[in-house]
Amino acid sequence: MSTWNPENDVDLLSGSEDEEDVSMKRDYHGREAILFVVDANLQTAGVERLLEALNIIRTAFISGLLVNDKDLIGLIFANTKHSPPPLEASALDNIVMPDNCAVFLPLRQLTKPIVEHYLEFMGGVETQFADVYGLAEPDGRGRFDLMIRLCIEMLEKCGKKLNNAKIAYVTDVREPHPSNSNHFQAALQKASDLEGKEFEFHVIPMVDDFDYEPFYKEFITLSRAIELDAFQVPDAQMLREILSDRKLKQDFLRRCLGHFSFYLGPNLSMSVQYYNYFQRRAYPRKVQILRRDNSVVRTKRVITVQKQKDDGSQDIEHEYQIKVTGGWYTCNVGERDLRISMDQLNRVRNLHKPQMMLLGFKHRSSLPEVSYIKPANFMYPDDQSIIGSKRLFRALWERCLVRDKIAICLFMCKRKSIPRYVALVPVEAPDNGEDKNYRSLLCGDGFKIVYLPEAKHIRHLDLQDWNNTENTADEQKVEFFQKIIKKLRVDYQPNLINDPSLDALQANLLALSLDFSTDTKGLDNLLDTSQQDKRIEKLLPDYEMFAPEAEPHKKRAAKSTTAGASGPKMAKIDDDQLKEFEFVKSLNKDEALTSCTAAQLHFILQHHFDVTMPKSSKKAKLVAKIEELHK
């Protein structure tokens, strides 16, 4: 995060610039645009390298169509011999086309026909690219400065308001012109035009051992207005992955969650902004389609106001429509109706602006490594609202790093939200040699906002009058509540692991709309296991190994009499015993009459009750008759 280093900052307090212009807030409205420029020299090393570059752009097209179809994307081929017009030739009416450049796709929103057109082009690119576009003669080098001018003109005349425009130049040539030529100096002068227009220029090398020294190191530093020594050679493979995912290193604007003021003390504050570490993978919006033509049903919320007649009837005297913001709430107070408009309601809800207040500092060891509440956010300064915020922020960050301290703050992240206790943990940008995952580039020097699950970290601070100390809990209650917090479960949504359900949904959408199948890897792209092992090693000492539990011997269960199973064996009943009435009564009491034979049951009925039953009577009927006579 070198952008808020005081050594690289412009002295805003010197009065060299208009203070009103500096303090004016940046306009965050607009669209993102990315213009792909593919060097035709890629075909000289074999058509496989050109296909690899086009496949990267194909992945970016598909991801843009599925995730955010409002971004503008264009495609230009540079250093070509021929300049065939694009499919929409009228889009270049107001643009001056230089030689050795061909516009395949002007800056447009991604739609299904555009992606289908690109896929059809890729189907025959192996045999048709050399004939349709060719390579610039005699040495395959066109005018680099004219190509940059074409890109700037296309971005300016795209017809949309842009807030983040990028030019991605895909090549394997280390310099567009010889260093002793006039075209080389003219190309370097175009870097100042990019810096003035605030357009980002990125080189995407198609070879891993790409050399930036001859030309692109100086060109990129001039376009970004940084020192030549501050340039760091990026990883070529990492840049190709970034391009396919369309998450470039400088894209902090899309991930910004809000801007707020950080109050350090009386009459001392600075403006900051906070972000998510990673974007959530948004599912496509649910829509309703018509059965006849699969067109999307578009609905619009409308509020209709009806006024009835005063005579008490249900007849409507007047009816009109209002906007959603023009509605109101009505409550009956006494005999009068009190009307509260939405504007008045929002003013009551928005009494407090998002802000953060510093409470104190604690040692870093007092913060547990794992917090069972919610994912952390990332914070760094914003010099647009309060001048000098970057300098003050860096001073606080450096002091916390040196003293190994964390800042305990009260944070209200957005309007109408509940203030939360948070800890600001200073973090440093990882070295390129330590982590080769390109997602680490999204995080730099700054503070990590860790949400605290309980208030134990602010227990021994001076809370003054605004927080009553009588509400504090003793240590036993805090430990008990910590155990409760650890039992809570939250949805684990790591964006570094592919969501199999989302991949399946996207594959089905692509198969339905573009009629081609995709390889869904599912959970194959897991995190680096070595990084996981390092984190697990820190947690292993907290676990205890118990002795193996002895499994008790299983007892043989008795057989059940249900489901046709045989019951326990009983002694045979002698006929002499049946002559005794007391013995028969005991059999009936123990419900053991079923153990007698049918002949014995007939003998009991005839001998003791003088009842004769038919010989064909079933055993159950005989038992029921004996039980009835006993009653």
Curated annotation (Swiss-Prot):
GO BP field: DNA recombination; double-strand break repair via nonhomologous end joining; telomere maintenance
CDD domains for this protein: KU70, vWA_ku
GO molecular function, one term: 5'-deoxyribose-5-phosphate lyase activity
Presence of the UniProt keyword Transferase in the record: no
InterPro entries hit by this protein: Ku70, Ku70/Ku80_beta-barrel_dom, Ku70_bridge/pillars_dom_sf, KU70_core_dom, Ku_C, Ku_N, SPOC-like_C_dom_sf, vWFA_dom_sf
Catalytic reaction list: ATP + H2O = ADP + phosphate + H(+)
One Gene Ontology CC term in the entry: Ku70:Ku80 complex
Gene3D superfamilies per record: 1.10.1600.10, 2.40.290.10, Ku70, bridge and pillars, von Willebrand factor, type A domain
Function according to Swiss-Prot or TrEMBL: Single-stranded DNA-dependent ATP-dependent helicase. Involved in non-homologous end joining (NHEJ) DNA double strand break repair. Sequence-specific DNA-binding protein that has a high affinity for a 31 bp sequence in the Yp1 gene. Site-specific DNA binding to 31 bp P element inverted repeats.
Name of this chain's protein: ATP-dependent DNA helicase 2 subunit 1
